[in-house]
Regions:
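Membrane-embedded transmembrane alpha-helical bundles that form the catalytic cores
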Residues: 1-184
C-alpha cells in the first residue's frame, strides 16, 4: 500500500520534483502533518502559484505577441527581448509547478527536494544544468548516464552518453521527435 501511495502521489506527478521511492518511503511510514509544516507548505504553494500565474503566464502572453510580429514589425532588439521573456517564462512555469508540488507535499507531511536553484545566475553551462530541474538531472544521471558508463568510458562513448541524456531530457520537456531530428514542432 505504501508503494501504491508513492505511485499516486499527486503533488509531484505533473512537473516534479521527481521523488524516488527510496527517498520518500520512510516519510510515507512516519510522516507528520503539523500546523508549522502546513504553513510552510502554503508559503511554497503560494510562491509557486505567483510564479506560474503572475509571471509565467504574463511573460508567455507577451512572448506570443512578440512572436506574432512580422519581420518588418520586429527588430533584433525585439527578438532578443522575446528570447529572454521566453526563457524566463519557462523557468517560472517549471519552478512554479515544482514549488506548488513541494508546498502540497509539505501540507501533507512530506518533504520533497528542491528542483530549481536559480539556474539563470549559473556561471557555466554545467552549473546551469546542476541548478535546472535538479531532480530530473539526478534521475537521468542515476538511471541512464551512469549505467551507460558515464564519463568512465572512451571520449566517443562519453559524448554518446551525454547526447543520449540530452536528447531524453528534451523529450521529457516536451520536444517531439520532429523537433529533435529537424528542430521543427
Amino acid at each position: 500500500i505504501n508503494f501504491a501511495l508513492y505511485i499516486a502521489m499527486f503533488p509531484q506527478l505533473i512537473a516534479g520534483p521527481i521523488v524516488r521511492y527510496e527517498d520518500v518511503e520512510q516519510q510515507i511510514r512516519s510522516r507528520k502533518v503539523t500546523i508549522a509544516g502546513f504553513g510552510v507548505g502554503c508559503e511554497f504553494f503560494i510562491r509557486g502559484m505567483v510564479k506560474k500565474v503572475l509571471f509565467a503566464n504574463l511573460l508567455g502572453q507577451i512572448f506570443v505577441r512578440i512572436q506574432a510580429l512580422s519581420n518588418v514589425q520586429s527588430s533584433i532588439v525585439t527578438a532578443w527581448i522575446g528570447a529572454i521573456l521566453y526563457t524566463l517564462q519557462i523557468y517560472y512555469d517549471f519552478s512554479g509547478y515544482s514549488d506548488m508540488a513541494i508546498g502540497l507535499g509539505r501540507m501533507f507531511g512530506f518533504r520533497f527536494p528542491q528542483n530549481f536553484n536559480y539556474p539563470y545566475i549559473a556561471e557555466s553551462i554545467t552549473d546551469f544544468w546542476r541548478r535546472w530541474h535538479m531532480t530530473l538531472g539526478t534521475w537521468f544521471g542515476e538511471y541512464v548516464y551512469i549505467p551507460l558508463g558515464g564519463n568512465r568510458v572512451t571520449t566517443a562513448k562519453h559524448i554518446r552518453n551525454l547526447l543520449i541524456v540530452w536528447g531524453l531530457t528534451g523529450v521529457w520537456h516536451g520536444a517531439g521527435i520532429n523537433f529533435l531530428l529537424r528542430s521543427e514542432e
